[in-house]
């Protein structure tokens, strides 16, 4: 698991072409590039599905949501899992629940 000052993340490519990204802590403009850089090589291999586990994410700013939307243009099936209530409301208010397939 990689770590910055306030964020930890893990990137795992599954044999079924599913890319699993787990993010915890605080994801914002100060550390978004570390996550984007770590995931980029796996996205180049064209995964069929991307699952982003955010159950332990305490904070995400608009740069996080922008990154996830950018990933959604590259991967046909993307899901945010274990989305905290506040983040769920933000994603819904932006009209992105279909694009990001938010799940509990």
Positions of PLM-derived features:
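Short loop/edge segments at beta-strand edges and connector loops
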Residues: 104
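Amphipathic alpha-helical interaction surfaces in cytosolic regulatory modules
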Residues: 26-100
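STAS-typified acidic loop motif
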Residues: 2-37, 56
């Amino acid at each position: 698991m990689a770590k910055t000052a306030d964020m930890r993340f893990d990137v795992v490519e599954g044999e079924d072409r599913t890319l699993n990204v787990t993010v915890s802590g605080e994801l914002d403009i100060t550390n978004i590039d570390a996550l984007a850089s770590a995931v980029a090589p796996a996205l180049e291999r064209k995964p069929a599905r991307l699952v982003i586990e955010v159950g332990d994410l305490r904070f995400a700013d608009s740069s996080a949501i922008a990154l996830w939307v950018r990933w959604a243009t590259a991967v046909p099936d993307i899901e945010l899992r274990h989305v905290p209530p506040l983040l769920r409301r933000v994603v819904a208010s932006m009209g992105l629940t279909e694009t990001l397939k938010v799940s509990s």
